[in-house]
UniProtKB/Swiss-Prot annotation:
E.C. number(s) listed in UniProt: 3.1.1.4
Site keyed Putative membrane binding site: positions: L18, L19, L34, T35, F39, V46, K76, T77, R79, Y82, R124, N125, I129
Catalysis: reaction(s): a 1,2-diacyl-sn-glycero-3-phosphocholine + H2O = a 1-acyl-sn-glycero-3-phosphocholine + a fatty acid + H(+)
Molecular function as annotated in GO: calcium ion binding; calcium-dependent phospholipase A2 activity; phospholipid binding; toxin activity
Full protein name: Basic phospholipase A2 ammodytoxin C
Native species: Vipera ammodytes ammodytes
Cofactor info, note text: Binds 1 Ca(2+) ion.
Described function: Snake venom phospholipase A2 (PLA2) that acts as a presynaptic neurotoxin, an inhibitor of blood coagulation, and has been found to bind with high affinity to intracellular proteins. The response of indirectly stimulated neuromuscular preparations to ammodytoxin (Atx) is triphasic. The first phase, the transient inhibition of the acetylcholine (ACh) release, starts soon after the addition of Atx and lasts for several minutes. This phase is probably independent of Atx enzymatic activity. The effect may be due to the specific binding of the toxin to presynaptic receptors.
Tissue: Expressed by the venom gland.
GO cellular component, one term: extracellular region
Keywords: Blood coagulation cascade inhibiting toxin, Calcium, Disulfide bond, Hemostasis impairing toxin, Host cytoplasm, Hydrolase, Lipid degradation, Lipid metabolism, Metal-binding, Neurotoxin, Presynaptic neurotoxin, Secreted, Signal, Toxin
Disulfide bonds listed in the record: C42-C131, C44-C60, C59-C111, C65-C138, C66-C104, C73-C97, C91-C102
Gene Ontology annotations of biological process type: arachidonate secretion; lipid catabolic process; negative regulation of T cell proliferation; phospholipid metabolic process
Family (UniProt): Belongs to the phospholipase A2 family. Group II subfamily. D49 sub-subfamily.
Length: 138
């Protein structure tokens, strides 16, 4: 519970669905989303280019693609509601955009959990300069 409080305090300045996404990540992985995923590999965090470094980084690549398929939505600022049923993330009722953003975030959080065993600390705070390859297409 203490970790949850610390993450919530750290995310107060974050707008929109990034807050919900962070809470989903924490709930699925037990990891602090800011320190564990914000600057991981070539795709976790703002932007992204090159080849995903591992399965976790690929989760971020797919998440970026998912957001890219929502041209009429604002994934980083539109808020949505979700809850848990028997431990599973369930997106709440909302607008079409809110629901699609929630589903993108839900899929990424689950992907992070499924790939916890291959999470590699060498990709935390990974320098962008090492992501030189041409990006894959979504």
């Amino acid at each position: 519970m203490r970790t949850l409080w610390i993450v919530a305090v750290c995310l107060i300045g974050v707008e929109g669905s990034l807050l919900e996404f962070g809470m989903m990540i924490l709930g699925e992985t037990g990891k602090n989303p800011l320190t564990s995923y914000s600057f991981y590999g070539c795709y976790c965090g703002v932007g992204g280019k090159g080849t995903p470094k591992d399965a976790t980084d690929r989760c971020c690549f797919v998440h970026d693609c998912c957001y890219g398929n929502l041209p009429d939505c604002s994934p980083k600022t539109d808020r949505y509601k979700y809850h848990r049923e028997n431990g599973a993330i369930v997106c709440g009722k909302g607008t079409s955009c809110e629901n699609r953003i929630c589903e993108c975030d839900r899929a990424a959080a689950i992907c992070f959990r499924k790939n916890l065993k291959t999470y590699n600390y060498i990709y935390r705070n990974y320098p962008d300069i090492l992501c030189k390859e041409e990006s894959e297409k979504c």
